[in-house]
A protein has these predicted regions:
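Catalytic nucleophile-His microenvironment captured as a short glycine-rich beta-strand/loop
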Residues: 113
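Conserved, helical-rich catalytic subdomain that frames metal- and/or nucleotide-binding sites
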Residues: 3, 8-103, 120-121, 127-131, ...
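Residue-level recognition of strand-loop junctions within catalytic nucleotide-signaling folds
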Residues: 116-118
């Protein structure tokens, strides 16, 4: 929509442009399950205080173009709801990290997971390991692209 990195605020209706994301290999994996976004948000609303990611740290890391800090600041509060319902999401994250991902996180309400990698060779190793694990039905390697570099 904005042709670049952006922060979604509110319920996703407000977009704020951010510094360009560092170019890096990304592995995306989807397990053979479906997740009800409605159910995830209903359960999230019932939690007392879901854990929130370090947005200030993430914004600083983006500004500094530090991939390790960016990855370390990532977070998705919806994981606290979706992973207990579908543990395979956590298993996919574990395989990615055990095979070299700087970090891995569920995308949106799930079930897809993405991992950030320092190089293509490590991504390929993790892709093989995921394929062998049988946890994911679809596995794709790609690269972060941002034309505002």
């Amino acid at each position: 929509v904005m042709r670049g990195t952006a922060l979604a605020e509110g319920i996703g209706e407000k977009l704020r442009p951010l510094p360009a994301m560092v170019k890096c290999p990304v592995l995306v994996a989807k397990p053979p399950i479906s997740v009800s976004t409605k159910t995830v948000y209903e359960r999230l609303d019932s939690l007392e205080q879901p854990p929130h990611p370090d947005m200030d740290g993430l914004l600083e890391a983006l500004q500094a173009r530090d991939l390790n800090r960016i990855a370390g600041s990532m977070g998705n509060i919806l994981e606290s709801v979706t992973i207990p319902m579908h543990p395979v999401i956590s298993q996919i994250k574990d395989v990615m990290v055990e095979n070299g991902a700087i970090n891995a996180m569920m995308s949106g309400s799930g079930p897809s997971v993405f991992g950030l990698f320092a190089d293509e060779a490590t991504l390929k190793q993790a892709k093989r390991a995921l394929r062998e694990s049988g946890y994911a039905a679809q596995i794709y390697g790609t690269t972060i692209y941002n034309n505002r570099r």
